[in-house]
Curated annotation (Swiss-Prot):
Its EC number is 4.1.1.37. Its main location: cytoplasm. HAMAP family: URO_D (MF_00218). The lineage of its organism: Bacteria, Pseudomonadati, Pseudomonadota, Betaproteobacteria, Burkholderiales. The keyword Cytoplasm applies. Keywords: Cytoplasm, Decarboxylase, Lyase, Porphyrin biosynthesis. InterPro entries: UROD/MetE-like_sf, Uroporphyrinogen_deCO2ase_HemE, Uroporphyrinogen_deCOase. It catalyses: uroporphyrinogen III + 4 H(+) = coproporphyrinogen III + 4 CO2. This is Uroporphyrinogen decarboxylase. Substrate binds at R28, Q29, A30, G31, R32, D78, Y154, S209, H339. Pathway: Porphyrin-containing compound metabolism; protoporphyrin-IX biosynthesis; coproporphyrinogen-III from 5-aminolevulinate: step 4/4. The record marks D78 as: Transition state stabilizer. Catalyzes the decarboxylation of four acetate groups of uroporphyrinogen-III to yield coproporphyrinogen-III. GO terms for biological process: protoporphyrinogen IX biosynthetic process from glutamate.
Length: 369
C-alpha cells in the first residue's frame, strides 16, 4: 500500500541506532511562516477547514519538504482534535488561537465526558493515509496528540491561559474530578494514536505543552502518570515494524530522571536543558536509555545565517560525540527546536538550519573516523 522508506535516519535515531548524519525536523514545520501555507489556509477558509480536509492537510504537511531536506514529516493537525470530538466545540479565531464553546468546569460537565467515537476523527486518519501515500517513502510520517494534562488545561480554561487558574483550582479543590477527566483523556489519546498508527503513522509523539506549569508533586501525579497511561496502551509495532514513541514536556527538564522511566523511545527537550547533562542522565547506555530530541531556541532563527550555523553547531557539540557503532545501540540525537517554530520566522533561516545540521553532524562523524 505504501512505498518503501528511502530515508530512515529519523526512525533509526529514535531507536538509538547509528546514522550518517543527525536527523532534523521542526515542531510546527508546516505552518504560518511559509507563504504557501498561508495561501492554502486562505483557500480552506479557516484552520479547521484546513485540518479537516484531507487534500489540504496533505498539501500543507508536504510544503516544508518541498523546500527543505528535512528527515521527517509530521501530520498537519491540532492537539485539540480529541476534546473537539468529545463535543466541546473547537474553533480558531484568526490570531487568537483555539477556543472551546463549552469548557469543562464542574462535576456535571466532567460526568458528561467520555472517550469519543474514533469515527468522529476519521478526517485525521484519512489525512494520515493520504500523506503517507503522497510522501512516496521520502521520509517517515510522525503522528501526534496532546497529552492528557495539556488537553485538560484547554478543556477547563476554554482557551490558552496565562496563569492556569481554573484548571489548577479544579486540580487542588477537586482532584477526584481532575483524575476522572485525565483518565478519560488518556484512554482517548491512546485510541487516537493507535488509529493513526493503523492509518500509516510511522512514529507517534505526545505533546505535553503545559506539563511545565505544574508544581513538582502535581507534575508526577497529574501529568506524568497519565502520559504513562497512554504509553502503556500504545502499539509497539505495526506489521512487524517498530513504531517509536516520543514524549515532549515543555519546561520538563528538571524531571528527566522521572521521565526516563516512561515506556517510550525518545524524550524531547526544550531550549533550557543542557544536552550533555541530559545525555548523561537519560541518553547513555543502560536500562531505559532514551534518544533525545531538541533543542535549539526557536528565536535563533531570527539571527543572521552565520549565527544560526554557530548556534546549530553549539547544540550538536553540546550533545557530544555521535554514536557511530553500527553493531549496537548508543546515545542518539534528533535535532529539533526547543518549541514550535515562530510564525514570524524567515523561511530562508530554516534552509540555513537544516543544511547546517546535516553538514556539521556529518563532519563530527568524520572527525571520529
Amino acid at each position: 500500500m505504501f512505498a518503501p522508506l528511502q530515508n530512515d535516519t529519523f526512525l533509526r535515531a529514535c531507536l538509538r541506532q547509528a546514522t550518517d548524519h543527525t536527523p532534523v525536523w521542526l515542531m510546527r514545520q508546516a505552518g504560518r511562516y511559509l507563504p504557501e501555507y498561508k495561501a492554502t489556509r486562505a483557500k480552506a477558509g479557516s484552520f479547521m477547514g484546513l485540518a479537516t480536509n484531507t487534500d489540504y492537510a496533505t498539501e500543507v504537511t508536504l510544503q516544508p519538504l518541498e523546500r527543505y531536506p528535512l528527515d521527517a514529516a509530521i501530520l498537519f493537525s491540532d492537539i485539540l482534535t480529541v476534546p473537539d470530538a468529545m463535543g466541546l466545540g473547537l474553533s480558531f479565531a484568526l490570531g487568537e488561537g483555539p477556543r472551546f464553546a463549552t469548557p469543562v468546569r464542574d462535576e456535571a460537565a466532567v460526568n458528561k465526558l467520555e472517550v469519543p467515537d474514533m469515527n468522529k476523527l476519521r478526517y485525521v486518519f484519512d489525512a494520515v493515509t493520504s500523506i503517507r501515500k503522497a510522501l512516496g517513502g521520502r521520509v517517515p510520517l510522525i503522528g501526534f496528540s496532546g497529552s492528557p494534562w495539556t488537553l485538560a488545561c484547554y478543556m477547563v480554561e476554554g482557551s490558552g491561559s496565562d496563569d492556569y487558574r481554573l484548571v489548577k483550582t479544579m486540580l487542588y479543590q477537586r482532584p477526584d474530578l481532575m483524575h476522572k477527566m485525565l483518565a478519560i483523556n488518556a484512554d482517548a489519546v491512546a485510541l487516537y494514536l493507535n488509529a493513526q498508527i493503523e492509518a500509516g503513522a510511522q512514529a507517534v509523539m505526545i505533546f505535553d505543552s503545559w506539563g511545565g506549569v505544574l508544581a513538582d508533586a502535581a507534575f508526577h501525579t497529574f501529568s506524568l502518570a497519565y502520559t504513562a497511561r497512554v504509553l502503556s496502551q500504545l502499539k509497539r509495532e505495526h506489521k512487524g515494524v517498530t513504531i517509536p514513541r516520543l514524549v515532549f514536556t515543555k519546561g520538563g527538564g528538571q524531571w528527566l530522571e522521572s521521565m526516563k522511566q516512561l515506556d517510550c523511545e525518545v524524550l524531547g527537550l526544550d531550549w533550557t536543558v543542557n544536552l550533555a547533562k541530559a545525555r548523561a542522565l537519560v541518553g547513555e547506555n543502560g536500562p531505559n536509555a532514551k534518544a533525545l530530541q531538541g533543542n535549539l531556541d526557536p528565536n535563533v532563527l531570527f539571527a543572521n545565517p552565520a549565527q544560526i550555523e554557530a548556534e546549530v553547531a553549539a547544540v550538536l557539540n553540546s550533545f557530544g560525540a555521535p554514536h557511530t557503532d553500527l553493531t549496537q545501540t548508543g546515545p542518539t540525537q534528533i535535532f529539533n527546536l526547543g518549541h514550535g517554530i515562530s510564525q514570524h520566522t524567515p523561511p530562508e533561516s530554516v534552509e540555513v538550519l537544516v543544511r547546517a545540521v546535516h553538514a556539521h553532524s556529518r563532519s563530527l562523524r568524520k572527525q571520529q573516523g
